[in-house]
C-alpha cells in the first residue's frame, strides 16, 4: 500500500487533461471477450483497476498490451475459466465478467465483487435479469455460478432501481442472446452510451442507450473493427474542477464533455464559482467568495454520487451552513471523520452530512478508505496548512489517471511513497 504526502497551501495553475472514463473502461475491458477478434481501445486511463482487469484476462488466456493510452485485447484463444476469488474480489467492476462470460459461453463462475466500502451494493437486479434471460444462478460458497445450458433468450426485464451495474451486465449478457431483450428502467449514464457504442461498432444491435428503455437484438457474432476511443471521465473532471475552484489561480481543465456534467456545473455556478465553459474544456478562475449550497445525489442526469466527496472540501470554503444527502449510498461518509482530523467543521446526523465554513484546514495523517473519499482528502490536503499524509493512497490510484504527474504539473508539491 502507498501513502501520499502533500505540502499544502500552494496555489495551482496551468492546465490538466482528463483521461478516459474509469466507469466505461472497467466495463469495456470485460466486454472485449465477447468479440471473436482483436479489440483496440484508445484513451484508456492509467489506473490500477485497468491493470487488475488485464491481469484477470491473462488468466483466461486473453492476451493484451497497454502502450501509451492504447490497449489491444485479443480474445481469440480465450478459455472459459472460473474466476472464484483472489484478483476478482479486489475490484467491484470484476462483476462485469458475469455478463460477459455468460454472453460468450453461456456460463460463468465469478467471485462476489469487492471494491470500495461505501455501503451495501447488492447484485439482486443482475441476478433477476440473468434468470429472465434463461440462466440458472446459484451462490456457491461466495462465488456466483451462472449456467444457461439451453442458451440465452431475449426477455423483457424491468429493473427495480436504475442500477448502472445491472444495466451494463444485462447488456453484455443479452447482446449475443437469441431474440430481443428489452431493459426497462435502465440507467442512463453516459458510460452506458459509450459501452453500447463500443458493442455496436463490433456488430451488436443496441438501441436506446442513454434512455430508460434499452432494446437489444441478439447477434451470433461480434468482431472488433475500428479503434474505440473511451469518453472523458466526468468524475475525474469534476474532481479537478473542485480542486481548481478551491485552491486554483486559474486552471484550464481539458478533454471534457460538459453536457455530461450539467448537474455538477449547475451546483458550482450556484456556489459562485467563476468558469468559462467551452466545447471541450473549462477554465476555472479564482473564486474567493463562495456561497454554501445543499447537495443531493441522484441517478444520472442528477448530481453524481461519485462527486459528492470531491466537492466537499470546496463546500468547506463557502460561507454558511450546507448539507450533503447521498440518496444512492447513504453510508458514503468515511471521509467525514478524516476531515474532522484536519479541522473541518463537519458532522453526520442520520446519514446527512452537515457542513460549516472552515477558515483553514490543518495538515494531518488521514486514511483514504476508498477512491472518491481519497480524492476528497487529496483536495483538502492541497488546501491545508502544513503537510498532509494520506495512508491507503493506493485507493486513489485505482480511480485517478496519472494523478501525481497531473498534480505536480499544476504546481502542487505532492509525492507517492511506499508505506
UniProtKB/Swiss-Prot annotation:
One example of a Gene Ontology biological process annotation: regulation of cell shape
CDD domains in the cross-refs: UdpNAET (cd01555)
Disulfide bonds: none
Chain positions recorded as phosphoenolpyruvate binding sites: 22-23
Top enzyme category: transferase
Binding of UDP-N-acetyl-alpha-D-glucosamine, residues: 92, 121-125, 306, 328
Organism domain of life: Bacteria
InterPro entries: Enolpyruvate_Tfrase_dom, Enolpyruvate_Tfrase_sf, MurA_subfamily, RNA3'P_cycl/enolpyr_Trfase_a/b, UDP_GlcNAc_COvinyl_MurA
Function noted in UniProt: Cell wall formation. Adds enolpyruvyl to UDP-N-acetylglucosamine.
PANTHER family for the chain: UDP-N-ACETYLGLUCOSAMINE 1-CARBOXYVINYLTRANSFERASE (PTHR43783), UDP-N-ACETYLGLUCOSAMINE 1-CARBOXYVINYLTRANSFERASE 2 (PTHR43783:SF2)
Record-stated family: Belongs to the EPSP synthase family. MurA subfamily.
Record protein name field: UDP-N-acetylglucosamine 1-carboxyvinyltransferase 2
Natural source organism: Latilactobacillus sakei subsp. sakei (strain 23K)
Amino acid at each position: 500500500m502507498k501513502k501520499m504526502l502533500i505540502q499544502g497551501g500552494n496555489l495551482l495553475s496551468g492546465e490538466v487533461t482528463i483521461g478516459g472514463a474509469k466507469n466505461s473502461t472497467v466495463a469495456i475491458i470485460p466486454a472485449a471477450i465477447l468479440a471473436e477478434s482483436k479489440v483496440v481501445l484508445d484513451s484508456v486511463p492509467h489506473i490500477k483497476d485497468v491493470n487488475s482487469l488485464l491481469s484477470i484476462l491473462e488468466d483466461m488466456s486473453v492476451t493484451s498490451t497497454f502502450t501509451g493510452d492504447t490497449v489491444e485485447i485479443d480474445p481469440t484463444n480465450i478459455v472459459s475459466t472460473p474466476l472464484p476469488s483472489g484478483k476478482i474480489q479486489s475490484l467491484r467492476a470484476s462483476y462485469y465478467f458475469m455478463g460477459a462470460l455468460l454472453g460468450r459461453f453461456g456460463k460463468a463462475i465469478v467471485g462476489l465483487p469487492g471494491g470500495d466500502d461505501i455501503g451495501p451494493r447488492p447484485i439482486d437486479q443482475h441476478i433477476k435479469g440473468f434468470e429472465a434471460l434463461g440462466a440458472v444462478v446459484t451462490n456457491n460458497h461466495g462465488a456466483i455460478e451462472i449456467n444457461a445450458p439451453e442458451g440465452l433468450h431475449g426477455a423483457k426485464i424491468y429493473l427495480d432501481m436504475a442500477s448502472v451495474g445491472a444495466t451494463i451486465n444485462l447488456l453484455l449478457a443479452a447482446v449475443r442472446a437469441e431474440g430481443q431483450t428489452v431493459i426497462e428502467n435502465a440507467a442512463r449514464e453516459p458510460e452506458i452510451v459509450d459501452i453500447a457504442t463500443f458493442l455496436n461498432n463490433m456488430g451488436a444491435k443496441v438501441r436506446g442507450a442513454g434512455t430508460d428503455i434499452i432494446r437489444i437484438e441478439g447477434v451470433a457474432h461480434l468482431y472488433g473493427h475500428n479503434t474505440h476511443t473511451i469518453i472523458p471521465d466526468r468524475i475525474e473532471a469534476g474532481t479537478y474542477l473542485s480542486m481548481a475552484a478551491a485552491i486554483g489561480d486559474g486552471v484550464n481543465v481539458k478533454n471534457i464533455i460538459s453536457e455530461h456534467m450539467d448537474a455538477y456545473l449547475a451546483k458550482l455556478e450556484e456556489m459562485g464559482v467563476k468558469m468559462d465553459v467551452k466545447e471541450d474544456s473549462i477554465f476555472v478562475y479564482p473564486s474567493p467568495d463562495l456561497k454554501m449550497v445543499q447537495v443531493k445525489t441522484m441517478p444520472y442526469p442528477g448530481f453524481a454520487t461519485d462527486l459528492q466527496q470531491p466537492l466537499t472540501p470546496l463546500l468547506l470554503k463557502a460561507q454558511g451552513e450546507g448539507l450533503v444527502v447521498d440518496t444512492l449510498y447513504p453510508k458514503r461518509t468515511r471521509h467525514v471523520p478524516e476531515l474532522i482530523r484536519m479541522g473541518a467543521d463537519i458532522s453526520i446526523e442520520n446519514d446527512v452530512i452537515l457542513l460549516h465554513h472552515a477558515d483553514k484546514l490543518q495538515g494531518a495523517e488521514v486514511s483514504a478508505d476508498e477512491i472518491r473519499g481519497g480524492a476528497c482528502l487529496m483536495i483538502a490536503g492541497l488546501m491545508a496548512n502544513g503537510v498532509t499524509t494520506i495512508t491507503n493512497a493506493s485507493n486513489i490510484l485505482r480511480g485517478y489517471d496519472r494523478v501525481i504527474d497531473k498534480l505536480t504539473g499544476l504546481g502542487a508539491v505532492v509525492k507517492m511513497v511506499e508505506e
